[in-house]
Amino acid sequence: MAQVINTNYLSLVTQNNLNKSQGTLGSAIERLSSGLRINSAKDDAAGQAIANRFTSNVNGLTQASRNANDGISIAQTTEGALNEINNNLQRIRELTVQAKNGTNSNSDITSIQNEVKNVLDEINRISEQTQFNGVKVLSGEKSEMVIQVGTNDNETIKFNLDKVDNDTLGVASDKLFDTKTEKKGVTAAGAGVTDAKKINAAATLDMMVSLVKEFNLDGKPVTDKFIVTKGGKDYVATKSDFELDATGTKLGLKASATTEFKVDAGKDVKTLNVKDDALATLDKAINTIDESRSKLGAIQNRFESTINNLNNTVNNLSASRSRILDADYATEVSNMSRGQILQQAGTSVLAQANQVPQTVLSLLR
């Protein structure tokens, strides 16, 4: 090797190696400080792209798991409301069984109906006011709930939010109770009439005979009765016998007293009765609630299974991403130690290399 002054080759080689060791030391320190093997695309371009996709999936699946938990929450909220409606229906059924007992007076049944009406109003209130995050779950406002449980389009779970109220359950008050209006009937007055009249073409007596069906006097039913109107007064015969021939007509009221009466139309009596199929109607409504609750229970189990699967997937993807992205501290500490040693050695050697041109000066002495 020529002895020169302007170019110190050994110093240049030493500086180059010192730069390399410094880069190695800097990279090791960066990885140790960040905990990542890939801090920029230059560290591993392909690995960085793969890790980024894994990050996207992990973040999406984590959110999907939270979505599924929200689905469980809304199903639990809905089921809780249905449970309360079921309790109300059970109370109505109990009251209906009580109302069907023959020992109840009309006022007793009216009192029972009043309580039933209040319970039915509560069912409608629950239907209208039960909500989750502003969504009314039983009013029919939103018939279908869609929960995103994946990281891609159409990865959803759907379940129905059925409208539940008195009308849809078929338990409105008029479906359980029946109001009947009973006529008080007639008010009897006057005495019996026993005479008979002859009727012919020249008669000036006006009579009207009218058949009455189901006349009830003093609580005793009679049949085949006639009203005879004469001079503005009405007479009733329980039996009658008429003869018609070519020359004239005889009207006979045989073996029966007649009675003057008037109709009292202003005093109708209303009776309240439980419908014959009221209990069957309530059983059908309770079965409807049971079916809805079973569906919500099934969807909750499905969401729990989905959450478990999502969490497992997140764990596996996170582990895969870690193997690509995260720094191995054992390796990086070793690299840092090696870099530090090379830096110290390089600095010392560079000092020695810089002294080489000094040997040329000895030739000038």
Curated annotation (Swiss-Prot):
Q: What is its main location?
A: secreted
Induction of its expression: Although swimmer cells have only a few flagella, the elongated swarmer cells are profusely covered by thousands of new flagella synthesized specifically in response to growth on surfaces or in highly viscous liquids.
- Tell me the first and last residues of the signal peptide: none
| Keyword Secreted found | yes
GO molecular function per UniProt: structural molecule activity
Cite the SUPFAM superfamilies for this sequence.
Phase 1 flagellin (SSF64518)
Give the subcellular location: Secreted; Bacterial flagellum
Q: Which GO terms describe its cellular component?
A: bacterial-type flagellum; extracellular region
Q: Which UniProt keywords apply?
A: Bacterial flagellum, Secreted
PANTHER family reported for this sequence: FLAGELLIN
Write out the similarity annotation.
Belongs to the bacterial flagellin family.
What does this protein's UniProt record list under function? Answer: Flagellin is the subunit protein which polymerizes to form the filaments of bacterial flagella.
Name-wise, this protein is Flagellin 1
The lineage is: Bacteria, Pseudomonadati, Pseudomonadota, Gammaproteobacteria, Enterobacterales
